[in-house]
Amino acid sequence: MRRFGALLLLTITLLAGCGGRESPVSPDEAPETALTEQDVINMYTAASAVYDWFDLTTLPLDMEDARTEGDLTYYRVDAENLSLPVSTVAELTDSALPWQPQRVTITSLADLRETAESYLSPEIVDNLFALSPDHYKDFDGVLYATDGGRGSNLYLLDKTVAAEQVDADHWTVTVTFYADSWAFEKPSTTVGYSQAVLDLEHTADGWKFTSFVPSDGLDLEAETVFQFT
C-alpha cells in the first residue's frame, strides 16, 4: 500500500510539472521546430524595440544618477528585468503558445551588445553602435547613456507586419508603413505607403534578422507615397 501511495504521489507531481506554461526563450534558444507566422512577428516586434534603442530613442534612464565627460552628461541605464514587447494576438490559431522574448537585464555595454545580438546579426549591431559612438558608455563597468532621441517620423500614420516562410531556414517580414500628414500639413498633405522586406535567417547562432529598418521607417521617397498641395 505504501508503495502504491508513493507511486501515486510521484505521478501527480510529474503531471503538475508538465502542466505549467513554458518559459519564454530568446531567438537563439528558440526550439528547432518550425516557427509560426506569429512567432516571427513577435520576434520582429521585440527586435524592433532593441533596434530603436540605438536609432530612435534610448534605454530607460535613472535621471538622479549622472556622470559627465567633456560636454556630455550621461545617466545610468535603468534596465533591470526589462520586458520586451510582443505583437497583440487576438486569437491563437493553434494550441501552441507563440514565441515570446525573455526579460533582459542590461547593466553594461557587454549586456547591451549581447541583447542586440540575440535578435540582430553582428553586422547590424556593429552599424548600430557606430551610429552614435557616444550614446552609450560604461563608467566603472556600469552602463550610462545620454538622454534624448531623434523623434519619431511625423508622417507615419500606422504600420502592418506580415511574415512569410521562404524555406526552413529563412523567413521574410514585410512591414508596410502608411503616411498621412493632413493633421499638421493641411491644406497640403502627404499620403500613401512604403514597404520594407526584412530577412530572418537561421544561423549557427540561432534565428537572426540580417536586414532591418527603424520602427518608423516610412520612406517618403517611395513611388507609392504622394504629396498634394
Map each language-model feature to its residues:
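Bacterial signal peptide processing site
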Residues: 19-22
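Positively charged n-region of N-terminal signal peptides that target proteins for export
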Residues: 1-9
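Exposed beta-sheet edge and beta->alpha loop/turn motif
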Residues: 149-229
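Polar low-complexity intrinsically disordered regions enriched in Ser/Thr and small residues
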Residues: 8, 73, 144, 151-154
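C-terminal motif of bacterial Sec signal peptides marking the signal peptidase cleavage site
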Residues: 14-17
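Intrinsically disordered, low-complexity serine/threonine-rich repeat tracts
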Residues: 25-31
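Core segments of small alpha/beta cavity-forming domains
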Residues: 31-147
